[in-house]
Amino acid sequence: MELRDLQIFQSVADQGSVSSAAKELNYVQSNVTARIKQLENELKTPLFYRHKRGMTLTAEGRKMLVYVNKILQDVDELKQVFLDSETPSGILKIGTVETVSTLPTILSSYYKSYPNVDLSLQAGLTEELIREVLDHQLDGAFISGPIKHPLIEQYDVSTEKLMLVTQNKTFHIEEFTTTPLLVFNQGCGYRSKLERWLKDEGLLPKRIMEFNILETLLNSVALGLGITLVPQSAVHHLSKAGKVHCHAIPEKYGSISTVFIRRKDSYMTNSMRSFLKTIEEHHHINML
């Protein structure tokens, strides 16, 4: 069993097919197929179900993937320990929810200070970003917090006011039962706050419409499709233009914190250490 066998196995598991894995790894398909078969023979168990749509992991394959992910992560960290220089460099894979108002400032400041670091950004919802940090797919992520998890450490970024956004100037709480609720998909911190508020009020929304792009969601509110709850900074431009109107909500639900998370047990590169320092500096400025 060689390291590249584990890399091939991981790629096929992630991609769901030999052809996609071969393309990702720049291997010929026959080599990928042969390596997977050799691995199964060596372990004396099938690791994949083969079907017309591709390949999916068996129960033993899922067990194998847990070990493979850990081994390959350890190998990457081992390389990083010896390659990590005093000057931050390399790639930082960072996830973020869409509405972190301080993100452009943080990224700009970091890039100016450490131009040798390549920042790879990926947008997502809080729950999926947490999962990807835990799975070592991301080095860290900006999410709605705070959270509690034994494998995660978090750093304060900002706290923002949440506003109910409507097309009309006035709003009455009973409108939740007559007007569609426009929200991000499950796993969004703003949606969780709004649903908690409605539950406490004993209100059942008329209809829930899910979005995955902030701009589309807000433009839909501006056109009168429904109402939503987002950070004030995210809707400031539309509110200023008079296209939508913002309404305060009870203090208990009216704010949300953004935190930056990373795995506690992941190797702290100089690039990540510098990134955390930049976050801390901007958080301190915002608190003044």
UniProtKB/Swiss-Prot annotation:
For whether the record's keyword set contains Transcription regulation, the answer is yes
Q: Where is the HTH lysR-type domain?
A: 1-58
Q: Name one GO molecular function term.
A: transcription cis-regulatory region binding
Q: Which UniProt keywords apply?
A: DNA-binding, Transcription, Transcription regulation
Cystine pairings recorded for this chain: none
Task: Tell me which Gene3D superfamilies the record gives.
Answer: 3.40.190.290, Winged helix-like DNA-binding domain superfamily/Winged helix DNA-binding domain
InterPro entries, alphabetized: LysR_subst-bd, Tscrpt_reg_HTH_LysR, WH-like_DNA-bd_sf, WH_DNA-bd_sf
Pfam families hit by this protein: HTH_1, LysR_substrate
Family, similarity comment: Belongs to the LysR transcriptional regulatory family.
- Which protein is depicted? HTH-type transcriptional regulator CzcR
Q: What is the lineage of its organism?
A: Bacteria, Bacillati, Bacillota, Bacilli, Bacillales
Q: Which gene encodes it?
A: czcR
